[in-house]
Amino acid sequence: MGGISIWQLLIIAVIVVLLFGTKKLGSIGSDLGASIKGFKKAMSDDEPKQDKTSQDADFTAKTIADKQADTNQEQAKTEDAKRHDKEQV
């Protein structure tokens, strides 16, 4: 009903061949095939490299006390850095 029938596809194919010619369509087809082949090769080349270098993230559960200890250590480091900067001036 609303779809394209085989006859409509054949008519479109004949019109395309008449417009472009068989030589032009052949070269376009071979260029398209070569580009698809190159794309697939590039995709398969990237996958092994990605698998070798990728590592899962190391997530550790932290409690509130651990987080507070981390922030205290960071604050102490920044205070030491500030004192060191003041001493240099």
Swiss-Prot record:
Disordered: annotated span: 65-89
Stretches that traverse the bilayer: 1-21
GO BP term, pick one: protein transport by the Tat complex
Origin: domain of life: Bacteria
Residue ranges, compositional bias (Basic and acidic residues): 76-89
GO molecular function (one): lipid binding
Assembly behavior: The Tat system comprises two distinct complexes: a TatABC complex, containing multiple copies of TatA, TatB and TatC subunits, and a separate TatA complex, containing only TatA subunits. Substrates initially bind to the TatABC complex, which probably triggers association of the separate TatA complex to form the active translocon. A complex containing only TatA and TatB has also been identified. It could be either an assembly intermediate or a disassembly intermediate generated during translocation activity.
Protein family according to the UniProt entry: Belongs to the TatA/E family.
Record-given protein name: Sec-independent protein translocase protein TatA
Protein's organism: Escherichia coli (strain K12)
Taxonomic lineage from the root: Bacteria, Pseudomonadati, Pseudomonadota, Gammaproteobacteria, Enterobacterales
Gene label: tatA
